[in-house]
């Protein structure tokens, strides 16, 4: 049992007549396993939110099919899909109390009053909002509103929980707290969860599995470690973190070793141009002493920086760290 | 905030207050004082006059009917304009402002051209079917509805745009049908805009004169509304009744506005 997306294509008409329509999703096929926390990761406008809205039934695909837990949902309206959806800007029902918000899906389903009350109490407890039950959403902070929205979505016991940039509107500190909390919540509830994010750190930290989407296509599917260590292509490599290019090969700036003496096999000579200390790391800008005199970035820890006595105008020799490079895994066909 | 000199503020205040007094407060207060020139005699005399009570009843019927129609169609058109894309949307939006910019007399004449039972475009067919529009209540409701058409829509549309469709989609994904979403999410969301639009439409409908005069035929005791009667009595030197009726119309409008400002929450989040 899982969510199967097969050959989904979605175009949006472009503003202005005569232009080619914008292709948001281009023949996307994907299987999302049950009970896992999956991140759809990619740059803005890459199609990941559109895919999420198509799974939820908030948007219709031009072609292709969506199967949720074995049921063909392609032509089911949103209210029949039993999907919990959490919006970036909370979509709180402003005229209802927090408890009423959470109870909404159950009241629509005409569950007995006692059952609704019990369930709402349990969920508010789960999201730590018990003491706010009678407040209006406008009296809550952003993080609290989003937790309320999550409880509301979980109340209907959805087959799948979909979160569209759920922490995007929150400040950095709350965002970090909430994603740790989401991870723990998922370990308790185990509902199949898909969340959209453009923040690679968020995806790497929270997700069991990451789907990288760019320009309407799936670039790679894998665990956070697989994606980080064995990116399928340069796009994934660049999107998941900072990169540095030596002789046409991409490396992580912290996966390059710096020596102050020559003679290491495969090392290349360079000269330190600038250095920038940021917390525990020092970012070095070095100039390769080859024909092109390219400037690249290398990151070292501050302790390493000190022990080597690195400073501008010092000659150094660079070599990719042994063991950081993993053979590229088989590219995923989109 | 920009700081301004106390003198400038005093001058601005005087100008604004003076302007409002000369234009609004003074004339309206004169209507009130003239109404009560002879104590309550003008009012009691007016209420004893069957033509007056009939005109007031007719005004109430016409105003309430047209407000009800404008409420239903106003909400429908507003949702259509904000939530759906269709060809001709901008044209429809522009057309909705026509009743605000065209003189009510022209509205009345236009309706006459369509619904006149003898020479109208649609009137003879309707007359054959036994439906009389012109020179009867349906025509007056039609004219009043036309004139007050944009008021509900212009209040509701910006609020619908502001609240967006996320809440509606959230309700749908939680299992609500489109009707349940409308009743439980959309309508409560635009509640205050609706109340405000309805009150404006009601005030406008109570006071409509030009369009109603053309389509009603102004038949005393039959198709004469309060505003038409005010004019007629004033022309016929029955000023006390004219003032009393004007006073009642003004009170109705003021009560509407007061109710809204009391009901409306101080600060909507």
Regions from the PLM with identified roles:
Chain B
Residues 84-92, 121, 136, 166, ...:
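Membrane-helix interface segments
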Residues 5-6, 43, 50, 209-258:
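Interhelical loop and adjacent transmembrane-helix boundary motif
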Residues 1-5, 65-97, 109-113, 125, ...:
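Transmembrane-helix boundary motif in ABC transporter permease subunits
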Residues 22, 57, 61-73, 77, ...:
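Hydrophobic alpha-helical transmembrane segments of multipass integral membrane proteins
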Residues 11-15, 26, 30, 88, ...:
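C-terminal transmembrane helix and the adjacent membrane-cytosol boundary/short C-terminal tail
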């Amino acid at each position: 049992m899982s969510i199967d997306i097969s050959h989904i294509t979605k175009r949006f008409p472009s503003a202005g007549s005569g232009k080619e329509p914008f292709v948001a999703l281009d023949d996307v096929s994907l299987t999302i396993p049950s009970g896992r926390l999956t991140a759809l990761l990619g740059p803005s406008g890459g199609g990941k939110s559109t895919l999420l809205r198509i799974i939820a039934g908030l948007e219709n695909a031009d072609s292709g099919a969506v199967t949720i837990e074995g049921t063909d949902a392609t032509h089911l309206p949103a209210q029949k899909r039993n999907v919990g959806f959490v919006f970036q800007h909370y979509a709180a029902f402003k005229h209802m109390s927090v408890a009423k918000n959470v109870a909404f899906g159950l009241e629509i389903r005409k569950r007995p009053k006692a059952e609704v009350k019990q369930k709402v109490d349990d969920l508010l407890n789960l999201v730590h909002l018990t003491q706010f039950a009678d407040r209006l959403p406008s009296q809550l902070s952003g993080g609290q509103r989003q937790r309320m929205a999550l409880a509301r979505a979980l109340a209907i016991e959805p087959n799948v929980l979909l979160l569209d940039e759920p922490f995007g509107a929150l400040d950095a500190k709350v965002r970090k707290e909430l994603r740790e909390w989401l991870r723990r919540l998922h370990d308790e509830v185990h509902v199949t969860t898909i969340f959209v994010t453009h923040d690679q750190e968020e995806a790497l930290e929270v997700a069991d599995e990451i789907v990288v989407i760019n320009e309407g296509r799936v670039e790679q599917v894998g665990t956070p470690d697989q994606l980080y260590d064995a990116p399928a292509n340069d796009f994934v490599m660049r999107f998941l973190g900072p990169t540095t290019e030596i002789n046409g090969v991409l490396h992580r700036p912290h996966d390059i070793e710096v020596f102050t003496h020559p003679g290491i096999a495969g090392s290349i000579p360079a000269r330190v141009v600038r250095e920038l200390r940021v917390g525990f790391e020092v970012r070095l800008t070095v100039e390769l002493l080859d024909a092109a005199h390219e400037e690249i970035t290398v990151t070292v820890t501050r302790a390493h920086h000190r022990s080597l006595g690195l400073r501008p105008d010092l000659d150094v020799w660079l070599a990719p760290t042994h063991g950081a490079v993993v053979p590229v895994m088989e590219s995923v066909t989109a | 905030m920009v700081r301004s000199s106390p003198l400038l503020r005093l001058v601005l205040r005087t100008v604004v207050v003076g302007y409002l007094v000369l234009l609004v407060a003074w004339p309206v207060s004169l209507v009130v004082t003239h109404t009560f020139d002879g104590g309550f005699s003008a009012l009691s005399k007016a209420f004893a006059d069957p033509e007056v009570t009939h005109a007031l009843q007719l005004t109430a019927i016409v105003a309430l009917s047209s407000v009800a129609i404008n409420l239903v169609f106003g909400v429908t058109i507003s949702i259509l304009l904000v939530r759906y894309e269709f060809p001709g949307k901008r044209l429809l939006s522009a057309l909705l402002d026509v009743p605000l910019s065209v003189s009510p007399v022209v509205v009345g004449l236009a309706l006459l051209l369509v619904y006149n039972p003898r020479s109208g475009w649609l009137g003879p067919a309707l007359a054959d079917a036994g439906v009389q529009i012109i020179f009867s209540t349906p025509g007056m409701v039609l004219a009043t509805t036309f004139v007050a058409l944009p008021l509900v829509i212009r209040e509701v549309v910006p609020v619908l745009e502001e609240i967006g469709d996320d809440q509606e989609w959230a309700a749908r994904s939680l299992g609500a049908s489109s009707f349940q979403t409308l009743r439980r999410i959309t309508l409560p969301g635009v509640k205050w805009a609706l109340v405000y639009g309805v009150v404006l439409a009601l005030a406008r409908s109570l006071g409509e004169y030009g369009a109603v005069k053309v389509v009603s035929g102004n038949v005393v005791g039959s198709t004469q509304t309060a505003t038409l009667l005010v004019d007629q009595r004033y022309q016929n030197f029955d000023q006390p009744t004219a003032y009393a009726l004007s006073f009642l119309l003004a009170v109705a409008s003021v009560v509407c506005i007061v109710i809204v400002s009391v009901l409306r929450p101080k600060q909507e989040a």
